[in-house]
Amino acid sequence: MPHALEAKYGLTAQELLDAIDKRFRLKVALEGAVAEVHFERKLKVASREGWLAAYEGHDTDGMHDFTVQTLSGATIRVEVKTIRNGSKVQVELQKTRAAKGDPSSRYYDRTHFDLVAVCMGRATGDWSEFRYGLVRELPVHKLYAHKLQVMHAIPDDGNLGPRWFSRFQDAIDAYTA
């Protein structure tokens, strides 16, 4: 039985995959979706194992990707990103476009989300591997103190710059501490 997208577009699954593979921007968008699916898998496991009370995914423009409820009752807003292509392991925290008349609107406000979950798949080939950073520990934009800096290095050594965590549970523990 064909997938709904095959029926909708009149293409085979192979043709759809080939179309994605040939288009850079479409692949970038797909990688973002892949990262979100892998992160949601982690949330499902955390909920099933009993160290996360609940979570909700959001697919709404202008909203963070997930809201997580901890066992202690804390609510954590999570934004999922992928690392940038290139030799440096870093994440870019800015929106695709700025609003007309407000160049600072392209940058994330420090209150937009609490935690960033960065998929490491482009660097490691493992799309289920993440690093987690607390927004309150990330540097601010040099021109707009209420906005986040755009580029953030993710060091291998946790002693460099803001703390980055390789385990989601460690990031939650640090957030609620």
Outline where the language-model segments fall.
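Structural alpha-beta junctions
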Residues: 48-51, 140-142
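Catalytic cores of nucleic-acid endonucleases
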Residues: 80-130
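Conserved catalytic cores of phosphodiester-cleaving nucleases, focusing on short active-site segments
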Residues: 43, 66-68, 74-86
